[in-house]
């Protein structure tokens, strides 16, 4: 078999669970049409649970339609961009689907963004409307961006009566320094009320024709790992396809009978599509958390008999040692998934020893509408992030972007499927650079260095931009970090290459020690530890201790920030 056929023959298909299709049936629907169908099908089922407050699918549809009618009355129309600057709460779900109901584009903004970052996204996305948490309004005001309308909402609006004060105080603690605008300020600025739009308008939004294939649904912004964040263009078809792909790959659930923990932030594509949209598509109840309080999440898993739990590496690394983790019967859950970054093998092993349950890893990015690969439930492989989900094609290309790599060799992962973005918003050059042609079709270049083994499982090595060239050798930053994490006194680590005229790049390790080890372990001891476990050319030449490391929105160590800092930028 030639190299090209080794990938195009899809060797991973033999590992699909029985009954899983090579490609799923994708409904010819827009996202709001899907939500309306689900609401009619599961009318009396619980859709959202918010700190004890329950909202049925029927009631959720009514709220979505009322809010859509209210937005339309304020001038929001098809083609507009509506920004959501919200924490996880029922208002997020309502506003998200209401904007889509009108044919508008949604651009979710991270609640932890500074006013400068908010300004960039508002201007770049051409948003005219912002749905905003009241405690975040100051950041919108500071941007100075001219907006047609700002709708304010409070986290307490959908809290049970006994939780209202607690909710406000918890948020004040989490978002210290932020304050709610006074009634006078609201009136002076002409701000709209979320609840007023709900109560004043009937559930009769205007009829809008949406082309699922052509019309944009969401403009999610990438993390800005190279320059300013940019938006991936995701159509209604992309969104509908992804939920169909994911649900067909994990045929574990009973429609209308599942409960999913929804603490991953909805502004991020992982929480937005895998948790929120796919959860609702299954008729599940979503248990929402505004802030990721571990004790509350663990209690809710048992209280509501949760069946699905989606997390990120930092969460599992914390839970594997947390004293209250054993309060949950993890073996009862049907699905435990880790995404957004690779999980250290030591964490996987410690988790399995402690809980008796298995974490399934997956892979994806904003540009793939969250997911392209996942681990089959019956046959996960350690060290692998899984196999392509139904409808996906994957291959490994050489560094020059011309030829496919032989099976087992490392190169750049390229992808093709119905969930792949249409391109980057207002960046035609970036779009052209993001795709390569294979077999007469466009394939997405992920920028990730990956290999595929003989069985069709894929293995992650590093981001292409994080590959360090030292004395002519290629060094994967992640490989060095994996060794550092094996040290019992290292809590966190980030490795980058620092440009050097003589050797290409010097390898630098930023290290956070466990509190009891600080001041007792030297930089040279860390270097010596690495010498015992790494080839000579992979050993860091510089070690710098830190109290903490910069993180991305999903808790990854931000190598970009470390790299910029080390280069004096």
Which residue ranges define each predicted feature?
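Gly/Ser/Thr-rich phosphate-binding loop
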Residues: 306-311, 320-381, 393, 402
